[in-house]
């Protein structure tokens, strides 16, 4: 009986924790394996991902993956992105195409903004 009670308590706590977790915004990084600018951007995107656990990062290779390429086309069409060049960074309704180390990091950080402050529980 105690085992069942303990299991029920843990199950209830799991549902409460899942219910409190808000969905995260998605940052899309579309790249090509043959693109030198994409390779230059990758370490920055990895760093950004570590800094911002509040955002879900999706790194999608488009030259060898038809599903990723189709998603890229769909997102580009919706946002009015012309040309389909990579790297392309998309966050919510904003986008940046291209990357040059030292020039784009600030623009990308500004695009995603600062993390929301969590409310202080009393």
Regions found by a protein language model. Give the residues of each.
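Thiol/disulfide oxidoreductase modules built on the thioredoxin-like
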Residues: 75-85, 96-102
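Positively charged n-region of N-terminal signal peptides that target proteins for export
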Residues: 1-5
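Thiol-based oxidoreductase modules, predominantly thioredoxin-like and allied folds used
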Residues: 54-70
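Non-catalytic, surface beta->alpha helical segment in thiol-disulfide oxidoreductase systems
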Residues: 90-121
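Extracytoplasmic/secreted envelope proteins and their assembly/folding machinery
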Residues: 41-45, 69, 73, 105-109
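Local sequence-structure signature of Cys/Sec-based thiol-disulfide redox active-site neighborhoods
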Residues: 20-58
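Bacterial N-terminal signal peptides
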Residues: 7-14
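Sec/Tat signal peptide C-region and signal peptidase I cleavage site
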Residues: 15-19
């Amino acid at each position: 009986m105690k085992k069942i009670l303990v299991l029920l308590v843990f199950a209830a706590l799991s549902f409460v924790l899942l219910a409190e977790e808000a969905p995260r915004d998605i940052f899309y990084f579309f790249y090509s394996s043959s693109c030198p600018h994409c390779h230059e951007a990758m370490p920055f995107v990895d760093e950004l991902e570590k800094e911002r656990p509040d955002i879900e990062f999706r790194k999608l290779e488009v030259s060898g993956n038809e599903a990723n390429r189709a998603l890229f086309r769909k997102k580009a069409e919706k946002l009015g992105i012309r040309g389909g060049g990579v790297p392309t960074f998309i966050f919510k309704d904003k986008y940046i195409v291209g990357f040059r180390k030292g020039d784009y990091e600030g623009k990308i950080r500004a695009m995603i903004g600062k993390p929301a402050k969590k409310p202080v529980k009393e």
